[in-house]
């Protein structure tokens, strides 16, 4: 038990606070439905570097800063305290991120954007709405999926993959 706690403390994903539990996850999920997250969305640029050339932007990943989100909704709870409960919370974060991005004008993106989403999000109505709002810019949106999510439900992954491929 002591070794497990020490490993958690050393984890690069560890956040301060008590371990996330089911009751707390439910309460946080409710808060996430209405908390402002627009100012918590960050951008990370992926650049390809070729020998003898300057770097070219591949895409700009859009994500919600989890440490800032923790400070806003649950400053005394380590959101990474339980892998599966964190996964549950990210589904709500995904929906909120899509809602914020859908409200922006994404029709004239200079660079591609990347979103790391849960498979359940890709299969949900919020993603369908986002896809409609992006319109002709769908070729500029890259969707990343987590391997753990893929292997947890291969049938859902295949449905999501087919949906994404069929919709551009």
Provide a role label for each language-model segment.
Residues 133-168:
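The catalytic core of metal-dependent phosphodiesterases that act on cyclic dinucleotides
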Residues 4-6:
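Flexible, Lys/Arg-rich cytosolic regulatory linkers and terminal tails that connect or flank
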Residues 8-136:
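Bacterial c-di-GMP phosphodiesterase EAL domain
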């Amino acid at each position: 038990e002591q070794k497990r706690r020490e490993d958690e403390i050393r984890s690069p994903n560890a956040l301060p606070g008590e371990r996330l539990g089911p009751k707390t996850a439910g309460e946080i999920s409710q808060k996430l439905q209405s908390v402002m997250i627009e100012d918590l969305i960050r951008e990370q640029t992926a650049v390809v570097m070729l020998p003898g050339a300057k770097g070219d932007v591949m895409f700009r990943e859009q994500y919600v800063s989890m440490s800032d989100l923790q400070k806003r909704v649950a400053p005394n709870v380590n959101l990474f305290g339980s892998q599966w409960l964190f996964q549950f919370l990210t589904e709500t974060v995904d929906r909120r991120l899509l809602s914020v991005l859908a409200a922006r004008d994404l029709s004239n993106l200079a660079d591609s954007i990347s979103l790391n989403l849960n498979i359940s999000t890709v299969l949900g109505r919020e993603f369908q709405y986002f896809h409609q709002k992006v319109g002709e810019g769908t070729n500029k949106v890259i969707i990343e999926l987590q391997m753990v999510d893929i292997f947890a439900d291969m049938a859902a992954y295949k449905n999501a993959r087919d949906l994404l491929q069929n919709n551009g």
